[in-house]
Regions:
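Phosphate-coordination loops involved in phosphoryl transfer and adenosine-cofactor binding
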Residues: 2-5
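Conserved acidic carboxylate
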Residues: 10
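Two-component/phosphorelay signaling modules centered on CheY-like receiver
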Residues: 13-31
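Conserved phosphotransfer microenvironments
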Residues: 16, 36-41, 48-71, 79-82
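A structural preference for short, hydrophobic beta-strand core positions in alpha/beta folds
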Residues: 32-34, 76
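CheY-like receiver
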Residues: 41-42, 105
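Local beta-strand N-terminus motif with an aromatic residue
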Residues: 47-48, 89
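Output/docking surface of receiver
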Residues: 72, 77-114
Length: 114
C-alpha cells in the first residue's frame, strides 16, 4: 500500500473528489484544492507529490512552471499537455483517466527517502 502526502489540484469538483477518494484508498494522505495554492504554502507543506489537472493552470507560463518546480514531483492530468510544460512534470496521465493510471504515475514519481 502506498504512503505519502499528496496535493491534488483540480477545478472540477467531481474529478477532485474522485482523485482524492482513489488516492486515499491507496493509502495516501490527500489535500485537495480547486485552484493553485500560493507557492509559499506548497513549499511549507512539503508534499511528497502533486496531482495537477492542467485546467487549473490559469496564470502565465512562468507561474505554471514555478508551481510545478515548487510542487515537484508533479503528475499532470491533460487531454493535450502544453508543450512548454512537459519538461517540468514527472509524468503525464491522459484524460480521461482510466484505471489506476494516476496511482501508478505517482508510484513512479515519488522516490522514497533513504
Amino acid at each position: 500500500m502506498a504512503a505519502g502526502r499528496i496535493l491534488v489540484v483540480a477545478p472540477n469538483d467531481e474529478l477532485r473528489r474522485s482523485l482524492a477518494f482513489a488516492l486515499e484508498a491507496e493509502g495516501y494522505e490527500v489535500t485537495a484544492r480547486r485552484e493553485l495554492p500560493y507557492h509559499g504554502w506548497v513549499a511549507e507543506k512539503a508534499f511528497d507529490g502533486t496531482v495537477l489537472d492542467q485546467r487549473a493552470l490559469t496564470g502565465t507560463e512562468y507561474e505554471s512552471i514555478a508551481f510545478c518546480v515548487k510542487a515537484h514531483p508533479v503528475v499532470l492530468l491533460a487531454i493535450r499537455p502544453h508543450s512548454w510544460l512537459v519538461e517540468w512534470v514527472s509524468d503525464i496521465v491522459e484524460m480521461p483517466v482510466i484505471g489506476n493510471a494516476v496511482t501508478s504515475a505517482l508510484d513512479r514519481a515519488i522516490v522514497p527517502a533513504g
